[in-house]
Amino acid sequence: MNTFPLFFKLTNQPVLIVGGGEVAQRKADLLSRAGACITILAPQISQEIHQLLSDERHTLITAHYDKKYIDGKRIVIAGTDDEALNHQVHADCKALNIPVNVVDTPPLCDFIFPAIVDRNPIVIGISSNGKAPVLARLTRARLETLIPQGYGKLAKLAGDMRDEVKSKIPTLTGRRQFWEKAFEGKVSELMFAGRSVEAEQALKQQLEQTHQQLSSNSDVKQADPKSVGEVYIVGAGPGDPELLTFKALRLMQQADIVYYDALVSREVLDLCRRDADKVFVGKKRSNHAVAQQGINQLMIDAASSGKRVVRLKGGDPFVFGRGGEEIQALRAAGIAYQVVPGITAAGAASCYTGIPLTHRDYAQSVRFVTGFLKSGEPNTGFAALTNPNETVIFYMGLHSLERLTKGLMDAGRSPQTPIAIISQASMPTQQVMTGTLADIVAKHEANPLPTPALLIVGEVAKLHDELAWYGEHIVNTDQQAHALNML
């Protein structure tokens, strides 16, 4: 190591920043968050530093630099665009053994400002020793995606209970095991879900159980009652793994067992914890690998045995995903659960095809419709879908394309209404076919698209040719003929 990483207490400590511009302001913001009492020394300062000075801890000296100003300071930062002045500040500080940082000049720095991941009181600093600041920043960005915001609250709770835990669990090994269980289980998930009161109650309950086991001289591991697990209903999005949420990825990587649908892509499934059991419970129209009631019971049984269960569903769990039915069953069984939203197929199909679902010139509302009812019968509520200024999205509608288009036209929607079929939205295999209600059936019969597919009906569909940016567009025969005639 060229530098030693340590954390420096600056609360109420005097710090001098020489400079009043953007560079000085960035350092001042960081030091202010650490509780330092900052003196800004500069003839002129930026508006941002003016705002910083509203904090009564901080002081402004509108003067040119003089070495008298560094006397008594804990650290000094030189952040001016005057190279000679920065060297002078460095020399004066070295003479008085005051740590100094000359911004963006590593040879003149006694210490370096790291890239910071702040989950106070959990703080991570990343440094490249001035060799590659951009790489340090990118490393920080990656860590930001991996560490939940709730880590800070979890650490504060642990700090508040540290003395009580120490008094009830006398051995270091016992305390380590206690905290590992708390940080890897129910307590942490409650905190991450924003249920801090319940998290504290769960931690106290865990402590009391452990204390009772120790008091009775029983083996903690043998006497530990089997804990009830939890179920995470996770939206896997439309297929592109980069469209997963951070929370979805975190829960997928700590699951003991994963029940996944047919619409979950292999790329997404591969991101689950490697040693988790992965069980296919897919459903395609009336062909169900496992009936819904059976899926509910599988989740209940697994969670009751103490497992962390991920129910991985394509798209969003609450948009034609039967997530509501599943959590009703979990609630009735007394199983704890969380629901993690995913990007629904309509959102992905819209964005990945350049077809906005709403547009001030074409559509002021949007309606999501399923092609089939609970009974398995086709949805026939076409009378409510005739507004020309409304976009209609049909999920699971490709197999009944002819019935849907005829129903819309019979109900009064213009035969010239644009329609788009989007197959495998967001994936490298995405395909798009456009047409009108009157001709889309013939086009699809001539060049059928694979499922899963979604239908977008409305004037916005005609924007695809203009705004498309991703994947392959199926050229219709009229366009091909026109193109040949132009040769």
Swiss-Prot record:
Molecular function as annotated in GO: NAD binding; precorrin-2 dehydrogenase activity; sirohydrochlorin ferrochelatase activity; uroporphyrin-III C-methyltransferase activity
Protein name as it appears in the record: Siroheme synthase
This protein's UniProt keywords: Cobalamin biosynthesis, Lyase, Methyltransferase, Multifunctional enzyme, NAD, Oxidoreductase, Phosphoprotein, Porphyrin biosynthesis, S-adenosyl-L-methionine, Transferase
UniProt pathway annotation: Cofactor biosynthesis; adenosylcobalamin biosynthesis; precorrin-2 from uroporphyrinogen III: step 1/1; Cofactor biosynthesis; adenosylcobalamin biosynthesis; sirohydrochlorin from precorrin-2: step 1/1; Porphyrin-containing compound metabolism; siroheme biosynthesis; precorrin-2 from uroporphyrinogen III: step 1/1; Porphyrin-containing compound metabolism; siroheme biosynthesis; siroheme from sirohydrochlorin: step 1/1
PANTHER family cross-referenced by the UniProt entry: SIROHEME SYNTHASE, SIROHEME SYNTHASE-RELATED
Region (Uroporphyrinogen-III C-methyltransferase): 229-487
Matching Gene3D superfamilies: Cobalt-precorrin-4 Transmethylase, Domain 1, Methyltransferase, Cobalt-precorrin-4 Transmethylase, Domain 2, NAD(P)-binding Rossmann-like Domain, Sirohaem synthase, dimerisation domain, Siroheme synthase, domain 2
Amino acids binding S-adenosyl-L-methionine: 238, 314-316, 319, 344-345, 396, 425
Family the UniProt entry places it in: In the N-terminal section; belongs to the precorrin-2 dehydrogenase / sirohydrochlorin ferrochelatase family. In the C-terminal section; belongs to the precorrin methyltransferase family.
